[in-house]
Amino acid sequence: MFSKQQVHVLLILWMAKRPLTHEEIERMAVLAKYDDTPQGLRTRMIELERSGHVYRVDRDGVNSRHRHCWRFALTDDGREAISELFGKTETI
C-alpha cells in the first residue's frame, strides 16, 4: 500500500502527463494544497523510483537556479497503481 505522500506524487505525475522536475512537483503540490514538505516529496519520489513506479527520464529539466536537473515520469506499473487506486474513469 502507498503512503499519503506517495499517492500525492503519483497523482501529480499522472495529471501532468509529461515528465516533471522536483520543483514542478513541489509547485503542483502547493497548488493542490497538499501538506507535504519539499523534502518529504523528494523522499517519496525516491521510494517510488526504487519500487519501480517512477523513473528518471533525462536531465533536461532546468531548476530555479538555472541548473540541469532530473525529470521524472510514471512507469507502466505506476499508471496501473493509479488506475487500481482510483478505478477507470469514463469521459462523457
Model-derived segments and spans:
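Short alpha-helical segments that sit at the start of domains
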Residues: M1-A16
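DNA-binding alpha-helical recognition surfaces that contact promoter or target DNA
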Residues: L11, R27, T43
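Short acidic, hydrophobic short linear motifs in intrinsically disordered regions
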Residues: P19-V30
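Short amphipathic alpha-helical interaction segments
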Residues: D35-R50
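A short, conserved structural fragment
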Residues: E49-D60
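Short, Lys/Arg-rich nucleic-acid/phosphate-binding segment
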Residues: D58-C69
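Short, amphipathic alpha-helical interaction segments positioned at domain boundaries
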Residues: W70-I92
